[in-house]
């Protein structure tokens, strides 16, 4: 018996050359050709007990795919070169694989059984190739709903949770209207993730499909200002709040209101709007500037890549955690994500452009240095992380480590506040199982659980749709009983 995982090395999506791609906003990666992707799927075929599709939490850690993608099944079909059935199987659990195949951090790969001793199966690359190939072949077509129930559902927010809920409810026959405060549909998929990572044409293509299937979209509607939840509840049979985690965290240090301090989402949104033909405000333009990105996550990396494309003189990224190791640490056993050091697309670009990795670790920002009202630098200290025997970590300041970094533009990418205060502004309180304290009003996605992964947002959208459908069915039963 031939063990393909031993004879076939892991391979991921082909990428454009760094020196080429930093001069435009086109996607940096593309799908695999049939031959290589079949080989990658074959690496999955010797698995005895798959965990990649489990989709659960251990503490706050995601184990496997939260939407329970049938990964071993579509890998088998790809290995047999049956791409159409692989596409069908993929769509059984995932409304938007063209999104997850581009921007999901792939917890499935961290829980891949092969990853215990070898490089895991390139699941994310296979997923993207399946769906991109399906679009190329013309297999992805509008699914027309045969019969309408007569119920009307309003969904506030058009991110992955809202769109997934809309898709599910529409296919169940309910009439769905999605309300979005921005001028484009997609939420953070559209304005929070840069084009080189997720082309906006990919987002529009899916929105066009959903619209062709009967979903109605309204942009420029700010619920809470233009219309209240109470008013919507009077107009619709059910309302879903899928407004996401909206309030970005700020630095909270002296000088953080200076000119030149910008929040990451505002910066990335302005960049995408420029691609759509809008003028770029000078405060969101990194050209010729020394840029510091505070925050070591994916959004921070996207800011690094965007600043490079704008022509930044230099880019430095502050992270509060230590540098990761090259191999899985003992305290992160399988099936947890290995959380190892990797050179993301943005860091490869920074190394290619500036001949240096932009990442610095264990940095605490203490004060913004200003001249007049404008930022010119950041005073910092280096930290040391000590892990106690009980597993809890403590950070200490390294004596004598003070350093001032010059900066013309500081991008703050340290996440979002909890969503509960934003919900209260809309007049509702979130309760368990997607319901709120207002009858017929539901909540899902980051608006319910706080900032999370795209796959959790899709799962929440699918699950809240089940809750709403059951609620509407109960309303119908009560109506029949009363009559």
Regions found by a protein language model. Name each.
Residues 130-146, 205-225, 248-310, 426-443, ...:
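Glycine-rich dinucleotide-binding loop and its adjacent helix/turn
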Residues 201-250, 272-281, 308-431:
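A Rossmann-like FAD-binding core segment of flavoenzymes
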Residues 3-30, 38-42, 55, 66-80, ...:
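Beta1-alpha1 glycine-rich phosphate/pyrophosphate-binding loop at the start
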Residues 38-42, 46-54, 60-145, 211, ...:
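Glycine/serine-rich phosphate-binding loop and adjoining beta1-alpha1 elements at the start
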């Amino acid at each position: 018996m031939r063990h393909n995982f031993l004879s076939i090395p892991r391979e991921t999506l082909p990428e454009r050359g760094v020196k080429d791609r930093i001069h435009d906003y086109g996607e940096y990666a593309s799908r695999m050709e049939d031959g290589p992707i079949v080989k990658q799927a074959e690496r999955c075929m010797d698995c005895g007990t798959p965990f990649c599709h489990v989709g659960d939490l251990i503490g706050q850690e995601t184990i496997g795919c939260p939407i329970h993608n049938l990964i071993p099944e579509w890998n088998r079909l790809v290995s047999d070169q049956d791409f159409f059935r692989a596409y069908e199987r993929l769509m059984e659990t995932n409304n938007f694989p063209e999104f997850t195949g581009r921007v999901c951090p792939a917890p499935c790969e961290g829980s891949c059984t092969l990853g215990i001793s070898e490089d895991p199966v390139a699941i994310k690359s296979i997923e993207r190739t399946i769906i991109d190939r399906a679009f190329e072949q013309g297999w992805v077509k509008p699914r027309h709903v045969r019969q309408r129930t007569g119920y009307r559902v309003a969904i506030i927010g058009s991110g992955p949770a809202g769109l997934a809920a809309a898709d599910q409810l529409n296919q169940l026959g309910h009439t769905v209207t999605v309300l979005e405060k921005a001028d484009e549909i997609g939420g953070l998929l559209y304005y929070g993730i840069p084009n080189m990572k997720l082309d906006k044409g990919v987002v529009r293509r899916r929105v066009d499909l959903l619209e062709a299937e009967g979903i109605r979209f309204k942009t420029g509607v700010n619920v809470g200002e233009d219309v209240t939840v109470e008013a919507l509840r009077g107009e619709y049979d059910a309302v879903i709040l899928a407004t996401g985690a909206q309030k970005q965290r700020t630095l909270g240090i002296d000088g953080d209101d200076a000119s030149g301090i910008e929040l990451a989402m505002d910066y990335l949104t302005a960049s995408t709007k420029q691609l759509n033909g809008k003028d770029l405000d000078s405060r969101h333009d990194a050209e010729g500037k020394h840029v510091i990105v505070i925050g070591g996550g994916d959004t921070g990396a996207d800011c690094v890549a965007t600043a490079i494309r704008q022509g930044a003189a230099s880019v430095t990224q502050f992270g509060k955690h230590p540098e990761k190791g090259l191999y899985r640490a003992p305290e992160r056993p399988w099936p947890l994500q290995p959380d190892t050091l990797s050179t993301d697309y943005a860091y490869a670009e920074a190394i290619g452009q500036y001949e240096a990795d932009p990442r610095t670790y264990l940095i605490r920002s203490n004060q913004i240095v200003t001249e007049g009202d404008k930022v010119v630098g950041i005073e910092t200290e280096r930290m040391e992380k000590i892990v106690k025997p009980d597993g809890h970590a403590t950070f200490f300041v390294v004596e004598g480590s003070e350093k001032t970094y010059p900066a013309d533009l500081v991008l703050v990418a340290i996440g979002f506040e909890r969503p509960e205060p934003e919900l209260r502004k809309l007049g509702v309180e979130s309760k368990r199982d997607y319901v709120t304290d207002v009858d017929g009003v539901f909540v899902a996605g980051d608006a319910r659980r706080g900032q999370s992964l795209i796959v959790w947002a899709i799962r929440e959208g699918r699950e809240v749709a089940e809750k709403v459908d059951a609620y509407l069915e109960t309303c119908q039963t009560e109506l029949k009983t009363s009559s």
